[in-house]
Amino acid sequence: MSKRAKVVVSPEKIKKQSDIIEELKIYNRGKNKKYMITTYGCQMNEHDSETLSGMLENMGYSITTNKEEANLIIYNTCCVRENAELKVYGNIGALKALKKKNEDLIIAVCGCMMQQPQVVKEIKRKYRHVDLVFGTHNLYRFPELLSRSMETEGMFIEVWDEETGIVEGLPANRKYDLKGFINIMYGCNNFCTYCIVPYTRGRERSREVADIIREATDLANNGTKEITLLGQNVNSYGKTLEHPIDFADLLRALNKIDGIERIRFMTSHPKDLSERLIDAIAECDKVCEHFHLPFQSGSNQILKAMNRKYTKENYLSIVKKLKDRIPNIGLTTDIIVGFPGETEEDFQDTLDIVQEARYDSAYTFLYSIREGTPAAKMQNQIDEKVKQERFSRLLDKVNEISAEINQSYLNKVVEVLVEGPSKTDSNKLMGRTRQNKLVNFSGDESLIGKLVNVRIVECRTFSLNGEVIQE
């Protein structure tokens, strides 16, 4: 699938779904139908849920957070961690009693978990009250799938093993007004040995630049101030397109859009990080000085077993280049503890990277066996007690450095995009710096949606408190 012409879903197929949306809108008129979506996992799943929500709003449904009043409940699932899967099973099971009380309730389960045959088999066997099951590759067909499930006795299942083309023009009900997610690519070609994503999201496919710019421009025209570009590995953007282009070119093009104040992106694979990209981040005024660069392990032996295709030394040289070129950059990362075969020496190498790179924050994970991945069959699986002990030490080191970095912001003036009321104090506002630091401060609600200067007066491990500087 190297050419764009091979991966586009035809306008006729999209129109068919639009026609079904209109039919369901007429059918639902005056019925006050409500839906609820629970999303697990990454920002790509969140964006998929925004698409499902947009379709449902166009069908005449309105959103609710109350299961008791919902006519349709959707779980959009994640299979990266076992814990997320267990939560899904628990929540689906808990709906059985509600289904008995309300036989007209439609329960749908979708997302990455459904791309695994053993999961679908488990749902068919143990959760027969589920009405609709679909995966990641046919999400654009949701209107048709919902319609067919309404006409079907029992469970309706449609999961495609192969990825579809890139779909343009689907409606989306954005979770945030000021911030918007934009998928720039789908799938992954890296096949890290611990990761199930290439098997659930398919191989890498990039969207055309013109389509991405059109979506970003539409968001800007509707009041969006900040966009986050999404991909499993944004650094390899453009490789499947017919005309040569890379992620650095895309950033420079998006930087020219009027109305967009900030550009963020995730996730980046270290092996594909070019100096051209570092230059683009440094030179584009709207691209935020924040970089999420997962390293997963500091041990070259473990990195090789993970199929990460870089070494500890490679990674640290990239960090140095980023900090030299963008001195005020905020760095975040992903770290896995307890990968099969990890020794105490290997773990010390991980702590070494944390100490040298000095991350603003880190997403830390205990290694979780994922059926269907090479790592699941590896020898020397690590004892859970050892994992937990190492995880605790890692967390202590990460939090210690995070607190030190945050303390360096005391009395500094930072630019904050005001997002809304603080989650910890409803009398305050909250927003984020360009480095993605969470800042709480007092201010009038008229500031929401604006860029303001805030002086930091208190520093905490995970957030900052400040005072607005009046112009």
UniProtKB/Swiss-Prot annotation:
It catalyses: N(6)-dimethylallyladenosine(37) in tRNA + (sulfur carrier)-SH + AH2 + 2 S-adenosyl-L-methionine = 2-methylsulfanyl-N(6)-dimethylallyladenosine(37) in tRNA + (sulfur carrier)-H + 5'-deoxyadenosine + L-methionine + A + S-adenosyl-L-homocysteine + 2 H(+). GO terms for cellular component: cytosol. Residues 407-470 form the TRAM domain. [4Fe-4S] cluster 1 binds at C42, C78, C112. Binds 2 [4Fe-4S] clusters. One cluster is coordinated with 3 cysteines and an exchangeable S-adenosyl-L-methionine. Residues 33-151 form the MTTase N-terminal domain. Keywords: 4Fe-4S, Cytoplasm, Iron, Iron-sulfur, Metal-binding, S-adenosyl-L-methionine, Transferase, tRNA processing. It is found in: Cytoplasm. InterPro entries: Elp3/MiaA/NifB-like_rSAM (IPR006638), Methylthiotransferase (IPR005839), Methylthiotransferase_CS (IPR020612), Methylthiotransferase_N (IPR013848), Methylthiotransferase_N_sf (IPR038135), MiaB_methiolase (IPR006463), rSAM (IPR007197), rSAM_horseshoe (IPR023404). Its EC number is 2.8.4.3. Transmembrane segments: none annotated. PROSITE patterns: MTTASE_N, MTTASE_RADICAL, RADICAL_SAM, TRAM. Its cofactor is [4Fe-4S] cluster. [4Fe-4S] cluster 2 binds at C188, C192, C195. The keyword Nucleotide-binding does not apply. CDD domains: Radical_SAM (cd01335). GO terms for molecular function: 4 iron, 4 sulfur cluster binding; metal ion binding; N6-isopentenyladenosine methylthiotransferase activity. Catalyzes the methylthiolation of N6-(dimethylallyl)adenosine (i(6)A), leading to the formation of 2-methylthio-N6-(dimethylallyl)adenosine (ms(2)i(6)A) at position 37 in tRNAs that read codons beginning with uridine. Monomer. Belongs to the methylthiotransferase family. MiaB subfamily. This is tRNA-2-methylthio-N(6)-dimethylallyladenosine synthase. It comes from Alkaliphilus oremlandii (strain OhILAs).
